[in-house]
Amino acid sequence: MADLKGRFDDAKDKVEGTAKEAQGKVTDDKGKELEGKAQSTFADVKDKARDAGDDLKEGAEKLTDKVKEGFEDLKDKFSKDK
């Protein structure tokens, strides 16, 4: 649930940043334009980091499953040898 809230917050920040950037362009306010661009870019970075974390977690879960399968195979092999 926290991840979903984080993704929502990132999307909201991206939209707000894009709006500030557009406002800065329309009003020729370079500060507002850069602020918006920075906010939008930071939201993208957070979203990509969240994706990378999800990928790492998924990879770790797959590795754990493979290790468990390996232990089960070894256990079965030693049980048959007795």
Swiss-Prot record:
Pfam families: CsbD (PF05532). Residues 1-39 are annotated as: Disordered. SUPFAM superfamilies: Hypothetical protein YjbJ. Residues 1-36 have a biased composition (Basic and acidic residues). Belongs to the UPF0337 (CsbD) family. This is UPF0337 protein EF_1180. It comes from Enterococcus faecalis (strain ATCC 700802 / V583).
